[in-house]
């Protein structure tokens, strides 16, 4: 299936890759309701590279543990793609505690967010990791 995404002017684009459709959809809706983001929720990590090439995200949120492909595999594919290798990736997982996340826990150099997470906490992480907003 070939998906075309509309231009979104100044809105930042966030790709959410998570096999939990409820989490992915609620994160998408929360980010879009701020008015600052255009988000795409994807439940099949095997389609992450193809979707990212089409969607052209400014940031990718990816679940670490998924049955079809894990988040590390998705990150490796994105980092190997010349057009996507600089896109920030944030892992979302139930494998760490909120305290570990607050202490700056990283996996393969990527920020990690604990699951479950509140919408405003997720928004803060998105804002901190977007190239336009992070001050880097």
Functional labels for PLM-detected ranges:
Residues 1-15, 118-136:
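Non-catalytic signal-transmission and effector/linker regions of two-component phosphorelay proteins
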Residues 21-40:
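Two-component/phosphorelay signaling modules centered on CheY-like receiver
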Residues 42-46, 119:
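Conserved Asp/Asn-Gly motif in the active-site loop of CheY-like receiver
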Residues 55-61:
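Active-site beta3 strand of CheY-like receiver
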Residues 63, 93:
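Active-site residues of response regulator receiver
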Residues 66:
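Receiver (REC) domain active-site loop signature in two-component systems and cognate sites
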Residues 115:
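A Lys-centered signature of the CheY-like receiver
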